[in-house]
């Protein structure tokens, strides 16, 4: 029998503990995988984002312990992963709008400035 600890704080100002974080994150990763389909299968961003998202979703589906999930993904607390996934959903739109895969000169990629404002 495993014991799951419930943390009281993330220790990050403004970022509250999410009691349903695993469920929320799995949903966001599934949304992201679906949304990535708007990009061409050959687009570099789509390929790398799909690989990372599938890996992370696999961790979440196969592990129930939040600490183990955080350690395996190794990209912050699960609440931070939720923020990252929400931002990734926005980035897909930016990549799609800019049509970054159609660059005339692949040695001079455009600079995409992302702001949460």
Swiss-Prot record:
Membrane topology, as annotated: Peripheral membrane protein
Protein task: Accessory subunit of the mitochondrial membrane respiratory chain NADH dehydrogenase (Complex I), that is believed not to be involved in catalysis. Complex I functions in the transfer of electrons from NADH to the respiratory chain. The immediate electron acceptor for the enzyme is believed to be ubiquinone.
Subunit structure, as described in the record: Complex I is composed of about 45 different subunits.
PANTHER family from the UniProt entry: NADH DEHYDROGENASE [UBIQUINONE] 1 ALPHA SUBCOMPLEX SUBUNIT 5, NADH-UBIQUINONE OXIDOREDUCTASE 13 KD-B SUBUNIT
Principal location class: mitochondrion
Name under which the protein is recorded: Probable NADH dehydrogenase [ubiquinone] 1 alpha subcomplex subunit 5
InterPro entries (alphabetical): NDUFA5
Coiled-coil regions listed in the entry: none
Subcellular location: Mitochondrion inner membrane
Family to which the UniProt record says this protein belongs: Belongs to the complex I NDUFA5 subunit family.
Gene Ontology CC terms: mitochondrial inner membrane; respiratory chain complex I
Pfam family, any one: ETC_C1_NDUFA5
GO biological process: respiratory electron transport chain
Naturally occurring in which organism (per UniProt): Dictyostelium discoideum (Social amoeba)
Keywords: Electron transport, Membrane, Mitochondrion, Mitochondrion inner membrane, Respiratory chain, Transport
Gene that encodes it: ndufa5
């Amino acid at each position: 029998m495993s014991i799951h600890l419930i943390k009281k704080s993330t220790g990050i100002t403004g970022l509250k503990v999410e009691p349903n974080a695993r469920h929320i994150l799995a949903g966001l990763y599934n949304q992201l995988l679906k949304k990535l389909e708007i990009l061409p299968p050959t687009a570099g961003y789509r390929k790398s984002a799909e690989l990372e998202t599938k890996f992370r979703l696999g961790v979440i589906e196969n592990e129930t312990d939040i600490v183990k999930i955080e350690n395996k993904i190794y990209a912050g607390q699960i609440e931070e992963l939720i923020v990252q996934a929400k931002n990734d959903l926005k980035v897909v739109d930016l990549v799609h709008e800019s049509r970054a895969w159609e660059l005339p000169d692949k040695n001079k990629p455009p600079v995409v400035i992302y702001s949460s404002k």
